[in-house]
Amino acid sequence: MSSSYTITKKKKRDKNQYILGISFVLLLGSFFIPLVVLLPLQQALYHPFGYWFLEPPRSAYFIFTGSLVLLSLSLLMMISGLAKNKFAKGLIAAGIFISILLSVLSVDHYHYMNGNGIYINPFFGFGEKEFLWADVKEAKQIAVEEKNGLKDKNLTFVFKDGEQYSFLITETVRKAYPIFNVKLQEKGIQVTREFPE
């Protein structure tokens, strides 16, 4: 009887060490895993035909990071012995469920441009919002003041229905700028620059 108990206890200890290792990898990796995983995963899942660029908004990276931290903490709570009553077990299960849900939602949160227009898949939303180039009323490039001078920070599109959407000016957006600027000029729209006061 005692040898069976020892084997079971050893298996549980091995399982806990395995979970502990996973949770530490998730916790430490939560700051760089989104940078490495999120965009390639989105490109594999949502590879739209003929896009000029596809990227996750910055909020998708933050949410994905938060989901990994929450999953790591939930796993640590699970093996720490805090899950002795039903409430604690339910809290841990909810933490794991919410972290997985946030991960899925952050992978589904992206925006891209192509020859037809601008496509946005919001964090809380079902399906893409489509804004054709004919729907664009105004385009503004917003500069901010930094130590070294002015830097273009956001590219904001104002649509005819009054809605606005801002892209952070990343290297990807900067490379696509000449292409979508031609589309805007075809519609008689000039990108204006706004400076801080």
Whereabouts are the PLM-identified features?
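A generic structural signal for ordered secondary structure
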Residues: N116, E128, K187-I189
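Alpha-helical transmembrane signal-anchor/signal-peptide segments
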Residues: D108-F126
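Internal/C-terminal transmembrane anchor helices
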Residues: K84-Y112
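A membrane-cytosol interface segment of integral membrane proteins
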Residues: F157-E197
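N-terminal membrane-targeting/pre-transmembrane regions
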Residues: M1-K84
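Non-transmembrane, membrane-adjacent beta-strand/coil modules in membrane-associated proteins
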Residues: N121-T172
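Short charge-dense sequence patches
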Residues: I22-F24, S80-I92, F126-E138, F180
